[in-house]
């Protein structure tokens, strides 16, 4: 939702000669995902990176966002936009985060956190969590 981050992304794409190949959307992520996942013929993605903030109470959002309380809905809606072979990577830096695998049991979830924490932080691995998520085969 931030113009600053959207501008950074556009500049990065331009610098990497990928300008014009991607869409940039400024929206409340929860609203956009709900809208897209409710459409029968919405666009499908081979790869989705989902790295939400731990907490947000942006003026542009209807309600405050809390990753612990909203991650199931967020992951479900994003996963519904995957192609059959698509992969969703979900990550968070919330140190006390607990993934609710029980309510996501229809998805294949692999914890890849150890592979994504830099060696500099190996002594404190709970600074970051990451999962690879796919639809059941």
Give the positions of each predicted feature.
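S-adenosyl-L-methionine
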Residues: 2-47
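C-terminal catalytic and target-recognition region of SAM-dependent MTase-like enzymes
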Residues: 73, 87-137
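Anionic group-transfer/hydrolysis microenvironments
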Residues: 2, 53, 93
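Helix-to-beta-strand junctions that scaffold the AdoMet/dcAdoMet cofactor pocket
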Residues: 18, 82-84
